[in-house]
């Protein structure tokens, strides 16, 4: 391909063809050679913005590769699509909806969309009123006791985002009139509820039913179970449901029908996708944990990235760079799996959150025009807290046969702020933080440079099974500190990365039709498992055989 391309002027050859040519030309190129050839490579391939640093120097890229990636973005009209996203255009083409999660973090004084801003802040203010009442011990259950446990019942975006943020910001938990604990329940099999309910008192427990449609069977089955638990203990009175449930949904009428009091109904909108909804009242558990000021800082961090994304040239635009690096790795270097490796235990749920954000958004095979995609779309996204992952799957990263790209994430500072309750252990804890940071840097270095990172004397007689190929690309994201503002920034970076990649692949990142049909088929099978129907003739042999075992008609 490269020879034929050289016959034509560069401007007449598509960026995709140019990138394929660069792959062929640099097929043997190793990351260590890129660093050897460019002494100031870190300065040339890193970006500092606000409270974070993005280092992408350990990718298998050159200036020529970046130029063609930027050209590709321009041919796909990325600037136009960014403008469309930050308008009220219906960029969700299959559902004919806008995608305005960015509006959820607009400052109250924002003048460009006054009605939209007012709509959002009206609901946020209603949420803040409930948060203040609960924190002050003024919100009471049906028997008059103060609420001390809040259980969020949701699934997908109504669970993953709030749980991830609540856990990540545990250091910023606010003091309340009485100790307040926040819990999360999502699984439809009831196992989480079974484990949790025996630890709680009905009199002092409040449940949040968090469901955009207020029709998700996973969530409503759990909600019905806890309703029965409450009514068994406190009696079947309207005030039990009205005092012990808060609903968050687009469907006010369904919440009312279920029995939730109007003052306990918090609304969101169809233009908010579930996996983009933690900034809305779906984030109620977050606000309960870190307080109103903390929640507003989370929104402010995300809004700062929204502004950066809209107003920064591609060369310094972190979400654009993250996205284009992913395109290069996935579509040109054939690296089809991506590991997210935070070196901070508080980010325990971050990889799981990104799995939904990235794979549910961009796990598509049909373009916006209905044609099959021309390039592979979303890679497999996975990961774990880095220090734990070192003892689990880093063997594969270092010496396996799979090419894997990685994101390393770490805070620069920890254990040095006044609000930490464990400040008396600060010195030992700071040493532990430095231990985590040293491992983060060591692993990214070894993945990139391989044997080059080893001592030459050690390498001289090292058996091959102890050697390292390296050349595994990675980015490193350093946060000044993991706090509400910086976490808001981090999440928004990945949201916009996803959008940029969807533009390059020409797919809709705001629908999820792939998950719908499975739910419908489950509805068809449920009557058979419940004994209300026994005709299995329409089913495949495997499903028939499994159902017979489940019903005890044959031995398993």
Swiss-Prot record:
The active site is at 360 (proton donor), 391, 519. Keywords: Cytoplasm, Gluconeogenesis, Glycolysis, Isomerase. One of its GO terms (biological process) is glucose 6-phosphate metabolic process. InterPro entries: G6P_Isomerase, G6P_Isomerase_C, Phosphoglucose_isomerase_CS, SIS_dom_sf, SIS_PGI_1, SIS_PGI_2. Pathway: Carbohydrate biosynthesis; gluconeogenesis; Carbohydrate degradation; glycolysis; D-glyceraldehyde 3-phosphate and glycerone phosphate from D-glucose: step 2/4. It catalyses: alpha-D-glucose 6-phosphate = beta-D-fructose 6-phosphate. Transmembrane segments: none annotated. GO terms for cellular component: cytosol. Pfam families: PGI. It is found in: Cytoplasm. GO terms for molecular function: carbohydrate derivative binding; glucose-6-phosphate isomerase activity; monosaccharide binding. PROSITE patterns: P_GLUCOSE_ISOMERASE_1, P_GLUCOSE_ISOMERASE_2, P_GLUCOSE_ISOMERASE_3. It comes from the Bacteria. Its main location: cytoplasm. Its EC number is 5.3.1.9. PANTHER family: GLUCOSE-6-PHOSPHATE ISOMERASE. Catalyzes the reversible isomerization of glucose-6-phosphate to fructose-6-phosphate. Belongs to the GPI family. This is Glucose-6-phosphate isomerase. It comes from Acinetobacter baumannii (strain SDF).
């Amino acid at each position: 391909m490269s020879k034929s391309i050289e016959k034509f002027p560069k401007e007449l050859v598509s960026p995709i063809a140019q990138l394929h040519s660069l792959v062929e030309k640099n097929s043997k190129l190793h990351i260590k050679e890129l660093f050897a050839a460019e002494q100031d490579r870190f300065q040339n391939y890193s970006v500092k913005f606000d409270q974070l640093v993005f280092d992408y120097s350990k990718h298998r890229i050159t200036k020529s590769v970046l130029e063609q990636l930027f050209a590709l973005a321009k041919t796909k009209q990325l600037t136009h699509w960014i403008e469309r996203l930050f308008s009220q255009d219906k960029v969700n083409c299959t559902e004919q909806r806008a995608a305005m999660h960015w509006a959820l973090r607009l400052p109250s004084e924002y003048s460009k969309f006054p009605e939209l801003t007012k709509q959002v802040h009206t609901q946020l203010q209603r949420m803040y009123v409930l948060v203040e009442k609960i924190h002050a011990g003024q919100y009471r259950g049906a028997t008059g006791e103060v609420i001390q446990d809040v259980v969020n019942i949701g699934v997908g975006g109504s669970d993953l985002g709030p749980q991830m943020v609540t856990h990540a910001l545990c250091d910023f938990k606010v003091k309340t009139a009485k100790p307040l604990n926040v819990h999360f329940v999502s699984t439809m099999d009831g196992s989480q509820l079974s484990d949790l309910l025996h630890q709680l008192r009905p009199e002092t427990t409040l449940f949040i039913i968090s469901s955009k449609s207020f029709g998700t069977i996973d969530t409503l089955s759990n909600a019905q179970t806890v309703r029965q638990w409450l009514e068994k203990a406190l009696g079947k009175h309207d005030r039990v449901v009205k005092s012990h449930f808060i609903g968050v949904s687009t469907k006010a009428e369904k919440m009312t029908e279920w029995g939730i009091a109007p003052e306990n109904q918090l609304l969101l909108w169809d233009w908010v996708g579930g996996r983009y909804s933690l900034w809305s009242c779906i984030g109620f558990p977050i606000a309960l944990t870190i307080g109103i000021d903390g929640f507003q800082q989370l929104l402010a961090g995300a809004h700062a990235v929204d502004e950066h994304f809209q107003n920064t040239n591609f060369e310094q635009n972190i979400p654009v760079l993250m996205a284009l690096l992913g395109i290069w790795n996935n579509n040109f270097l054939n690296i089809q799996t991506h590991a997210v490796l935070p070196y901070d235990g508080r980010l325990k749920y971050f990889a799981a959150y990104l799995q939904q954000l990235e794979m549910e958004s961009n796990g598509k095979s049909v373009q916006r025009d209905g044609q099959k995609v021309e390039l592979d779309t979303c890679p497999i996204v996975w990961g774990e807290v880095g220090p734990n992952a070192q003892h689990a799957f880093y063997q594969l990263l270092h010496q396996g046969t799979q090419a894997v790209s990685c994101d390393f994430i770490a805070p620069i500072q920890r254990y040095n702020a006044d609000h930490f309750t464990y400040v008396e252990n600060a010195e030992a804890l700071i040493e532990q933080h430095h231990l985590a940071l040293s491992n983060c840097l060591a692993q990214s270095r070894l993945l990139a440079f391989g044997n080059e990172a080893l001592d030459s004397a050690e390498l001289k007689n090292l058996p091959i099974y102890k050697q390292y190929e390296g050349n595994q690309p990675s980015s490193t994201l350093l946060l000044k500190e993991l706090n509400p503002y910086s976490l808001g920034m981090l999440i928004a970076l990945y949201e916009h990365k996803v959008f940029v990649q969807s533009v390059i692949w020409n797919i809709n990142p705001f629908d999820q039709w792939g998950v719908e049909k499975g739910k419908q088929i489950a509805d068809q099978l449920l009557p058979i498992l419940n004994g209300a129907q026994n005709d299995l003739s329409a089913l495949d042999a495997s499903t028939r055989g499994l159902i017979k075992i489940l019903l005890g008609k044959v031995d398993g």
